[in-house]
Amino acid sequence: STFKNFMLSYYDQDYDGAISPEEALRVTELYLGFDEEDEEAVPITSLKGIEYCKNLINLECDFNAITSLDLSGLDKLEYVDCSYNLIKTANLSGCISLKQLYANVNEIGALNLKECANLQLVQAYKNKLTACDVSGMSKLVYLDVSQNQLTTLNISNCSEMLIVNCGSNKLAALDLSGLEKLTSLGCYNNNLTTLDTSK
């Protein structure tokens, strides 16, 4: 695969044509963003094998053709940009160090962030999310889930939240309780009839 070829090019230090467990553990950053100007570049469709990169901290794989993202168990991962792919499913279970997630312009139908308690920023606009629950995530400051298909959004008790954009969804209700620091709310183009902004 394209991802395997990339790994062999940069991390096969003993040139044996395979990535050993020891070599995989040396990987802390992966920059796999697709370069349209490179005529020989081939977009990545799968990140199979990334689960062995247990010490990965930063992952950028935007502008590819990835259909499924499984980063489960990568407990040192802090930054992910997987925007502009074809991702339908994303597994972030066990990503306990994750601070920033950019997953814009994909086809993600569900996103479970409950094990990502250190998240500070989430961008997941232009997906197919029908529900999103980040309630009680005490470090989350910024959330953009606009242009999805959300019928429910639970953002209550996110005590550090400053900015929420949930415009262009199908929300009929929105609970803003416990958002004492909220400074910006975009909830345009929904089915809201009332909005209680008392904090």
Label every PLM stretch briefly.
Residues 23, 49-52, 62, 73, ...:
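C-terminal capping segment of individual leucine-rich repeats
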Residues 47-50, 69-71, 90, 111-113, ...:
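Canonical leucine-rich repeat
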Residues 28-33, 59-61, 78-82, 99-103, ...:
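Conserved hydrophobic beta-strand positions in leucine-rich repeat
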Residues 1-58, 65, 75, 96, ...:
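N-terminal capping/linker segments that flank leucine-rich repeat
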Residues 91, 101, 112, 130, ...:
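Intrinsic-disorder/low-complexity detector
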Residues 60-62, 90, 112, 123-126, ...:
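Short, conserved structural micro-motifs that define repeat-unit consensus positions
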Residues 42, 64, 85, 103-106, ...:
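Consensus "Asn ladder" position of solenoid repeat domains
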